[in-house]
Regions:
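Conserved pre-ATP/AMP-binding loop-to-beta segment of ANL
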Residues: 3, 18-19, 134-157, 164, ...
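Conserved AMP-binding A3 loop
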Residues: 33-35, 153-180, 309
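Conserved structural elements of the adenylate-forming
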Residues: 37-44, 149, 168-189, 197, ...
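Conserved AMP-binding/adenylate-forming
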Residues: 46-90, 199, 396, 435
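Conserved AMP-binding/adenylation subdomain of ANL enzymes
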Residues: 176-193, 203-245, 259
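Gly/Ser/Thr-rich phosphate-binding loop
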Residues: 244-248, 257-319, 332
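Conserved ATP/PPi-binding loop(s) of AMP-dependent carboxylate-activating enzymes
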Residues: 326-330, 336-364, 395-397
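AMP-binding/adenylate-forming catalytic core of the ANL superfamily
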Residues: 345, 372-459, 476
Length: 489
């Protein structure tokens, strides 16, 4: 896509749909047309300019989902600034570590009572206080002609096997290209209404549920982030707003199967044409089949990494069981001798903030994914992981980060953290430990309380197992495969 076409795509989408609805905000019962939304974007842009925010500045966002946060992404593109996106549900230590990787102009938070030990925090609601002298017209869309698609746009965070959060850098061009390539498989349009219930601090919330719908000229129903308390009334807002396009996570699917005891979702799916997309983690075939049978809703699994964006997807009339689908156009894949997936995509990330790219790419410029897989009839099958990560509820979690934290508490003699397959969350976190103490019930409660406070709820240990000794390799390292086998006996 040439520069002129890129520059016009924002302007064209807004202009062609100026008086049509774009976002239905279920959080605040506020429905915005493209015109209303553009007014909000310009309002936030002007308020940031009043605070001396200028080109190439960084803003750190520690924010929950809101329609104003969505507008901030568009305002940031116009201002040519970079957004550092951090999940506010992470623990205080994790947030502090991420927020100090790069100096920011402001650190935006939702509530003055949030205590992240970060200076220069600003309450986000101050940024979108309405300017009374705004006179927006369709001609103001010319502002989009000056967008810079190549400069650094977002930094999101992923957990590496070392336990140190890595800042994944992307430009606006990557969001555009990946969205358009993915949409070639589905042909989304203004008839599609996406249900947005993933956090806007991760790629799933930004790419899958913001820019993919926008560049597809689709509508968005914005809701709070999904959690287990939302299961019983999961279908209420989708039914009310006639949602017909979902991005499910495997955790959502398994929890709906277990806890959704009503007929609202079943009847809705049976009587409406719905696209069910699945991402963020591998989907077990058992869960897929059970969900499709219960709701009469076809699920299309895809493969997408924070670093590469969309790689593959199943789609209508091209859906192979136990596979994540054919490669998208212009995506290249290779494999090492032990089946590790190597990737080259048109929307490859710019690198990790502050780190050299050398250890993450091979000599041919392919990204070393850490996942294992193979191609069958041009469809990618994921076989497992090479890197030491736990995926719990779609969240990448470093076992080493938890091990180091527990060791620092000096309660156990030895510690090993493993991810064990679990039906609802994908994997559960199991702590194997040794100790000469016989009763550590209070200490175990203390460990989990500290983990939730400092690292975040997703890091909470699901099961503690005491052993006399932890098995070791000949080199003296803890033998995690042996531990996993012992657990499964």
């Amino acid at each position: 896509m040439d520069l002129k076409t890129k520059s016009n795509i924002f302007q064209k989408i807004f202009a062609e749909n100026w008086d049509e609805y774009f976002i239905f905000d279920t959080i605040n019962s506020n429905n915005l047309t493209y015109k209303n939304f553009f007014e909000l974007v310009i309002n936030i842009k002007k308020n940031l300019e009043k605070r001396k925010v200028k080109e190439d500045d960084y803003l750190c966002l520690i924010l929950n989902n809101s329609i104003e946060l969505i507008a901030l992404f568009f305002a940031a593109a116009l201002l040519k600034i970079t957004l550092i996106c951090i999940d506010p549900s992470r623990g205080s230590d994790e947030i502090l570590k991420m927020s100090t990787i790069q100096k920011s102009k402001f650190y935006l938070i939702d509530d003055k009572h949030q205590n992240f030990d970060i200076p220069e925090t600003e309450i986000f609601s101050n940024i979108f206080q309405k300017n009374t002298n705004l006179n927006i017209s369709i001609s103001d869309l010319d502002l989009f002609n000056d967008l810079n698609y190549e400069r650094l746009f977002t930094i999101t965070f992923t957990s590496g096997s070392t336990g140190i959060p890595k800042g994944v850098m992307h430009n606006l061009n990557n969001y555009l290209k990946s969205s358009l390539l993915f949409n070639k498989r589905f042909n989304f349009s203004k008839n599609n209404i996406f249900y947005h219930n993933l956090p806007l601090s991760y790629i799933g919330g930004i790419l899958n549920l913001l820019f993919l719908p926008f560049f597809s000229k689709s509508k968005i129903v914005l809701d709070e982030q999904f959690n287990i308390s939302k299961v019983s009334n999961f279908w209420n807002n989708p039914v009310q707003y006639s949602v017909n396009t979902f991005w499910f996570t495997p955790t959502e699917l398994s929890l709906l199967l277990k806890l959704d005891r009503g007929n609202l979702g079943i009847e809705y799916c049976k009587n409406k044409t719905i696209v069910g997309l699945v991402g963020t983690a591998s989907l077990r075939e058992e869960i897929k089949n059970n969900f499709e049978n219960k709701y009469d809703l076809k699920l299309f699994e895809s493969y997408c990494l924070s670093e590469t964006f969309f790689v593959t997807t199943n789609y209508l009339n091209n859906d192979q069981a136990n596979h994540t689908g054919p490669l998208l156009d212009d995506v290249k894949v290779s494999f090492t001798s032990d089946n590790e997936i190597l990737l080259n995509t048109p929307s490859m990330f710019l690198g990790y903030l502050g780190l050299s790219n050398d250890e993450f790419f091979n000599n041919n410029g392919f990204y070393i994914s850490g996942d294992l897989g193979k191609l069958n009839n041009n469809s990618l099958q994921i076989l497992g992981r090479k890197k030491d990560l736990i995926i719990k509820g779609g969240m990448n979690i470093s076992p080493k980060r938890i091990e180091d934290f527990i060791i620092g508490l000096k309660i156990f003699d030895e510690v090993a953290i493993l991810g064990i397959e679990e039906y609802y969350m994908g994997e559960k976190i199991v702590c194997f430990y040794t100790s000469e103490e016989s009763n550590l019930n209070n200490e175990i409660k203390l460990i989990n309380n500290q983990i939730v406070q400092k690292l975040g709820l997703y890091f909470k240990i699901d099961e503690f197992i005491k052993l006399k000794i932890l098995p070791k390799t000949p080199s003296g390292k803890i033998n995690k495969p042996a531990l996993k086998s012992k657990y499964n006996e």
